[in-house]
Curated annotation (Swiss-Prot):
The keyword rRNA-binding does not apply. Its main location: cytoplasm. Pfam families: PLAC8 (PF04749). This is Cornifelin. Keywords: Cytoplasm, Keratinization. The gene is CNFN. It is found in: Cytoplasm. Belongs to the cornifelin family. InterPro entries: PLAC_motif_containing (IPR006461). PANTHER family: DUF614 FAMILY PROTEIN-RELATED. GO terms for biological process: keratinization.
Amino acid sequence: MSYPVTSQPQSASTCYQTQLSDWHTGLTDCCNDMPVCLCGTFAPLCLACRISDDFGECCCTPYLPGGLHSLRTGMRERYRIQGSIGKDWAALTFCLPCALCQMARELKIRE
């Protein structure tokens, strides 16, 4: 015996609001951590490889085209930091040492 369907199933929608935060330190706060500042200034690729490794990615990621950009964007996504891909691109293109230092400081604070 079959029964006719008298009502359609309703879709359940759950809306989660996520609170976005800011970077713990500013882009130009390089001197807050002098060892990171010196490494970012004189050996930025070494710092980039360390950041990548500390973030759980392959240490060769910074050498790939767009690798640093995806790393910074991934960091923003994981830690729910406000920003955009365009701002990530601008920071890494026009102020690479400062952006790397900011990323390294953020990892130190969050980990």
